[in-house]
Amino acid sequence: MNKHQVLKQYFGYDEFRDGQETLIDSILSGRDTLGIMPTGAGKSLCFQIPALMMDGITLVISPLISLMKDQVEALNQAGVHAAYLNSSLTASQYYRALAYAREGRYPIIYVAPERLVTEEFLDFARNTKISMVAIDEAHCVSQWGQDFRPSYLKIVEFIERMEVRPVVSAFTATATKEVRDDISDILMLRKPTVLTTGFDRPNLYFGVQAPKDKYETMKNFLELHPGQSGVIYCLTRKNVEEVCEKLRADGFSVTRYHAGLSDAERQKNQEDFIYDRAAIIGKDRKSGSAGMPRPIS
Protein backbone atom coordinates (compact mmCIF):
# COMPACT_ATOMS: atom_id res chain seq x y z
CA MET A 1 0.00 0.00 0.00
CA ASN A 2 1.07 3.59 -0.56
CA LYS A 3 0.80 6.29 2.09
CA HIS A 4 -2.65 7.46 0.93
CA GLN A 5 -4.02 3.93 1.08
CA VAL A 6 -2.57 3.42 4.58
CA LEU A 7 -4.09 6.74 5.67
CA LYS A 8 -7.53 5.70 4.45
CA GLN A 9 -7.55 2.03 5.44
CA TYR A 10 -6.21 2.32 8.98
CA PHE A 11 -7.02 5.87 10.01
CA GLY A 12 -10.10 6.71 7.93
CA TYR A 13 -8.86 9.98 6.42
CA ASP A 14 -8.96 10.96 2.76
CA GLU A 15 -6.35 13.72 2.92
CA PHE A 16 -3.26 14.59 4.91
CA ARG A 17 -3.19 17.62 7.17
CA ASP A 18 -0.69 20.46 7.00
CA GLY A 19 2.89 19.17 7.16
CA GLN A 20 2.07 15.48 7.57
CA GLU A 21 2.93 14.40 4.03
CA THR A 22 6.25 16.25 4.02
CA LEU A 23 7.33 14.60 7.27
CA ILE A 24 6.17 11.16 6.15
CA ASP A 25 8.04 11.47 2.84
CA SER A 26 11.19 12.54 4.69
CA ILE A 27 11.08 9.45 6.93
CA LEU A 28 10.35 7.12 4.02
CA SER A 29 13.35 8.55 2.14
CA GLY A 30 15.56 7.51 5.07
CA ARG A 31 16.23 10.98 6.49
CA ASP A 32 16.19 11.88 10.16
CA THR A 33 13.19 14.11 10.78
CA LEU A 34 12.06 16.68 13.34
CA GLY A 35 8.44 17.79 13.35
CA ILE A 36 7.22 20.69 15.49
CA MET A 37 3.44 20.65 15.34
CA PRO A 38 0.71 21.94 17.66
CA THR A 39 -1.30 19.57 19.82
CA GLY A 40 -4.05 18.01 17.74
CA ALA A 41 -2.22 18.45 14.41
CA GLY A 42 -1.73 14.71 13.90
CA LYS A 43 1.90 14.17 14.90
CA SER A 44 1.34 10.47 15.60
CA LEU A 45 0.34 9.71 12.01
CA CYS A 46 3.66 11.14 10.83
CA PHE A 47 5.50 8.17 12.33
CA GLN A 48 2.71 5.58 12.40
CA ILE A 49 2.13 5.63 8.65
CA PRO A 50 5.83 5.18 7.72
CA ALA A 51 6.03 2.45 10.36
CA LEU A 52 3.37 0.49 8.48
CA MET A 53 5.25 0.91 5.20
CA MET A 54 8.79 0.12 6.37
CA ASP A 55 10.32 -3.33 6.53
CA GLY A 56 10.95 -3.89 10.22
CA ILE A 57 9.85 -2.59 13.60
CA THR A 58 9.35 1.01 14.64
CA LEU A 59 10.09 1.80 18.27
CA VAL A 60 8.12 4.74 19.61
CA ILE A 61 9.64 6.34 22.71
CA SER A 62 6.95 7.88 24.90
CA PRO A 63 7.18 9.41 28.39
CA LEU A 64 3.79 8.41 29.78
CA ILE A 65 2.33 4.97 30.41
CA SER A 66 -1.18 6.32 29.87
CA LEU A 67 -0.22 7.83 26.52
CA MET A 68 1.32 4.56 25.34
CA LYS A 69 -1.74 2.60 26.41
CA ASP A 70 -4.16 4.95 24.66
CA GLN A 71 -2.21 5.02 21.39
CA VAL A 72 -1.69 1.25 21.30
CA GLU A 73 -5.38 0.64 21.99
CA ALA A 74 -6.31 3.06 19.19
CA LEU A 75 -3.95 1.29 16.78
CA ASN A 76 -5.28 -2.15 17.71
CA GLN A 77 -8.84 -0.94 17.19
CA ALA A 78 -7.79 0.34 13.75
CA GLY A 79 -6.46 -3.10 12.83
CA VAL A 80 -2.77 -2.39 13.46
CA HIS A 81 -0.89 -4.87 15.65
CA ALA A 82 0.99 -2.82 18.24
CA ALA A 83 2.27 -3.31 21.77
CA TYR A 84 3.81 -1.33 24.61
CA LEU A 85 6.67 -2.17 26.96
CA ASN A 86 6.73 -0.35 30.28
CA SER A 87 6.56 -0.83 34.04
CA SER A 88 2.80 -1.48 34.00
CA LEU A 89 3.44 -4.98 32.60
CA THR A 90 4.26 -7.99 34.72
CA ALA A 91 7.51 -9.81 33.94
CA SER A 92 5.64 -12.55 32.09
CA GLN A 93 3.65 -10.02 30.04
CA TYR A 94 6.83 -8.13 29.17
CA TYR A 95 8.75 -11.19 27.98
CA ARG A 96 5.74 -12.50 26.08
CA ALA A 97 5.45 -9.17 24.23
CA LEU A 98 9.16 -9.32 23.38
CA ALA A 99 8.76 -12.88 22.10
CA TYR A 100 5.84 -11.86 19.88
CA ALA A 101 7.87 -8.90 18.61
CA ARG A 102 10.73 -11.22 17.65
CA GLU A 103 8.22 -13.24 15.63
CA GLY A 104 7.32 -10.10 13.67
CA ARG A 105 3.81 -9.69 15.05
CA TYR A 106 4.18 -5.98 15.84
CA PRO A 107 5.26 -3.33 13.32
CA ILE A 108 4.98 -0.71 16.09
CA ILE A 109 6.16 -1.01 19.69
CA TYR A 110 5.84 1.77 22.25
CA VAL A 111 8.56 1.67 24.86
CA ALA A 112 9.49 3.70 27.93
CA PRO A 113 12.96 5.32 27.67
CA GLU A 114 14.10 3.59 30.87
CA ARG A 115 13.72 0.20 29.16
CA LEU A 116 15.98 0.97 26.21
CA VAL A 117 19.37 0.22 27.75
CA THR A 118 18.40 -2.83 29.78
CA GLU A 119 20.30 -5.91 28.63
CA GLU A 120 17.20 -7.87 27.63
CA PHE A 121 15.90 -5.03 25.47
CA LEU A 122 19.29 -4.36 23.89
CA ASP A 123 19.56 -8.05 23.05
CA PHE A 124 16.13 -7.89 21.44
CA ALA A 125 17.00 -4.75 19.43
CA ARG A 126 20.33 -6.10 18.21
CA ASN A 127 18.69 -9.27 16.92
CA THR A 128 15.65 -7.62 15.36
CA LYS A 129 15.38 -5.27 12.41
CA ILE A 130 14.60 -1.84 13.86
CA SER A 131 13.69 0.44 10.96
CA MET A 132 12.91 3.60 12.90
CA VAL A 133 13.13 5.08 16.36
CA ALA A 134 10.40 7.70 16.76
CA ILE A 135 10.62 9.99 19.78
CA ASP A 136 7.27 11.38 20.90
CA GLU A 137 7.21 14.43 23.19
CA ALA A 138 10.82 15.00 22.11
CA HIS A 139 11.12 18.22 24.14
CA CYS A 140 11.58 15.95 27.18
CA VAL A 141 15.22 15.55 26.09
CA SER A 142 15.92 19.27 26.48
CA GLN A 143 16.82 20.97 29.73
CA TRP A 144 15.35 24.13 28.20
CA GLY A 145 11.95 22.45 28.22
CA GLN A 146 9.62 22.48 31.20
CA ASP A 147 9.16 18.69 30.98
CA PHE A 148 12.83 17.64 30.93
CA ARG A 149 13.22 13.93 31.70
CA PRO A 150 16.74 12.58 32.32
CA SER A 151 15.58 9.16 31.11
CA TYR A 152 15.28 10.61 27.59
CA LEU A 153 19.06 10.93 27.48
CA LYS A 154 19.19 7.12 27.31
CA ILE A 155 17.80 7.28 23.78
CA VAL A 156 21.12 8.37 22.28
CA GLU A 157 23.01 5.65 24.15
CA PHE A 158 20.54 3.08 22.84
CA ILE A 159 20.87 4.22 19.22
CA GLU A 160 24.67 4.27 19.45
CA ARG A 161 24.71 0.69 20.74
CA MET A 162 22.70 -0.67 17.82
CA GLU A 163 24.66 -2.41 15.08
CA VAL A 164 22.68 -0.70 12.31
CA ARG A 165 21.49 2.85 12.94
CA PRO A 166 17.76 3.25 12.19
CA VAL A 167 16.02 6.34 10.89
CA VAL A 168 15.42 8.68 13.83
CA SER A 169 12.36 10.93 13.96
CA ALA A 170 11.33 13.30 16.73
CA PHE A 171 8.09 15.16 17.34
CA THR A 172 7.02 17.86 19.75
CA ALA A 173 4.56 20.69 20.18
CA THR A 174 7.26 22.89 21.74
CA ALA A 175 8.53 25.35 19.15
CA THR A 176 11.19 27.49 20.86
CA LYS A 177 14.49 27.71 19.01
CA GLU A 178 16.48 26.61 22.08
CA VAL A 179 14.43 23.44 22.50
CA ARG A 180 14.47 22.68 18.78
CA ASP A 181 18.25 23.03 18.61
CA ASP A 182 18.64 20.98 21.79
CA ILE A 183 16.58 18.13 20.34
CA SER A 184 18.68 18.00 17.17
CA ASP A 185 21.98 18.20 19.05
CA ILE A 186 21.24 15.81 21.92
CA LEU A 187 19.59 13.18 19.72
CA MET A 188 22.43 13.61 17.20
CA LEU A 189 20.03 13.90 14.27
CA ARG A 190 21.86 13.61 10.95
CA LYS A 191 21.01 16.44 8.53
CA PRO A 192 17.35 16.23 9.57
CA THR A 193 14.35 17.52 7.75
CA VAL A 194 12.95 20.12 10.17
CA LEU A 195 9.37 21.28 9.73
CA THR A 196 7.32 23.62 11.89
CA THR A 197 3.62 23.88 11.07
CA GLY A 198 1.30 26.73 11.95
CA PHE A 199 0.26 27.28 15.53
CA ASP A 200 -2.87 29.29 14.82
CA ARG A 201 -5.70 27.55 16.70
CA PRO A 202 -8.95 29.30 15.72
CA ASN A 203 -10.96 26.87 17.88
CA LEU A 204 -9.27 28.12 21.06
CA TYR A 205 -10.17 31.20 23.07
CA PHE A 206 -8.05 32.57 25.90
CA GLY A 207 -9.56 34.91 28.45
CA VAL A 208 -8.51 36.22 31.86
CA GLN A 209 -11.05 37.02 34.55
CA ALA A 210 -10.85 37.82 38.25
CA PRO A 211 -14.30 36.97 39.65
CA LYS A 212 -15.14 37.44 43.30
CA ASP A 213 -16.63 33.95 43.50
CA LYS A 214 -14.56 31.65 41.28
CA TYR A 215 -16.67 28.58 41.87
CA GLU A 216 -19.98 30.26 41.02
CA THR A 217 -18.46 31.75 37.87
CA MET A 218 -17.17 28.33 36.81
CA LYS A 219 -20.48 26.67 37.64
CA ASN A 220 -22.41 29.24 35.59
CA PHE A 221 -20.05 28.68 32.66
CA LEU A 222 -20.58 24.92 32.81
CA GLU A 223 -24.34 25.35 32.97
CA LEU A 224 -24.17 27.43 29.79
CA HIS A 225 -22.38 24.54 28.02
CA PRO A 226 -24.36 21.39 28.90
CA GLY A 227 -23.11 18.12 27.47
CA GLN A 228 -19.68 19.52 26.65
CA SER A 229 -16.36 18.34 28.04
CA GLY A 230 -13.47 20.17 29.65
CA VAL A 231 -10.45 20.19 31.93
CA ILE A 232 -10.38 22.33 35.07
CA TYR A 233 -6.89 23.18 36.30
CA CYS A 234 -6.36 23.99 39.96
CA LEU A 235 -3.30 25.21 41.85
CA THR A 236 -3.10 22.31 44.30
CA ARG A 237 -4.37 18.78 44.86
CA LYS A 238 -6.51 20.11 47.69
CA ASN A 239 -8.16 22.56 45.29
CA VAL A 240 -8.83 19.70 42.87
CA GLU A 241 -10.56 17.68 45.59
CA GLU A 242 -12.64 20.65 46.76
CA VAL A 243 -13.76 21.67 43.27
CA CYS A 244 -14.63 18.11 42.21
CA GLU A 245 -16.59 17.52 45.42
CA LYS A 246 -18.64 20.70 44.88
CA LEU A 247 -19.28 19.89 41.22
CA ARG A 248 -20.47 16.38 42.06
CA ALA A 249 -22.79 17.81 44.71
CA ASP A 250 -24.20 20.15 42.06
CA GLY A 251 -24.90 17.27 39.70
CA PHE A 252 -21.98 17.47 37.28
CA SER A 253 -20.25 14.42 35.82
CA VAL A 254 -16.70 14.96 37.07
CA THR A 255 -13.56 13.02 37.94
CA ARG A 256 -10.10 13.97 39.26
CA TYR A 257 -6.45 13.45 38.38
CA HIS A 258 -3.41 14.33 40.47
CA ALA A 259 -0.25 12.79 41.95
CA GLY A 260 -1.92 12.06 45.27
CA LEU A 261 -3.95 9.26 43.70
CA SER A 262 -2.70 5.73 43.07
CA ASP A 263 -1.59 4.80 39.55
CA ALA A 264 -4.63 2.57 39.19
CA GLU A 265 -7.07 5.31 40.18
CA ARG A 266 -5.41 7.90 37.95
CA GLN A 267 -5.62 5.50 35.02
CA LYS A 268 -9.27 4.67 35.71
CA ASN A 269 -10.21 8.34 36.09
CA GLN A 270 -8.38 9.28 32.92
CA GLU A 271 -10.16 6.53 30.98
CA ASP A 272 -13.51 7.67 32.41
CA PHE A 273 -12.82 11.12 30.97
CA ILE A 274 -11.46 9.95 27.61
CA TYR A 275 -14.31 7.51 27.00
CA ASP A 276 -17.11 9.91 28.00
CA ARG A 277 -17.95 8.35 31.35
CA ALA A 278 -17.08 11.71 32.91
CA ALA A 279 -17.54 15.03 31.10
CA ILE A 280 -15.18 17.04 33.29
CA ILE A 281 -11.80 16.28 34.83
CA GLY A 282 -10.13 18.32 37.54
CA LYS A 283 -6.31 18.41 37.53
CA ASP A 284 -3.61 20.19 39.44
CA ARG A 285 -1.30 22.44 37.45
CA LYS A 286 1.61 19.97 37.61
CA SER A 287 -0.33 17.23 35.84
CA GLY A 288 -0.21 18.75 32.38
CA SER A 289 -2.39 17.51 29.53
CA ALA A 290 -0.21 14.89 27.82
CA GLY A 291 -1.87 11.53 27.57
CA MET A 292 -5.46 12.78 27.32
CA PRO A 293 -6.29 12.47 23.62
CA ARG A 294 -9.88 13.67 23.83
CA PRO A 295 -11.49 16.57 21.96
CA ILE A 296 -12.27 19.35 24.44
CA SER A 297 -15.51 21.20 23.87
Where are the regions a protein language model picked out?
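Conserved Rossmann-like nucleotide-cofactor binding loop
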Residues: 66
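Short, Lys/Arg-enriched, disordered terminal segments
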Residues: 1-2
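Helicase motor core with emphasis on the C-terminal RecA-like subdomain
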Residues: 5-10, 14, 18, 22-44, ...
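Short "domain-exit" segments at the C-terminal end of structured domains
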Residues: 291-297
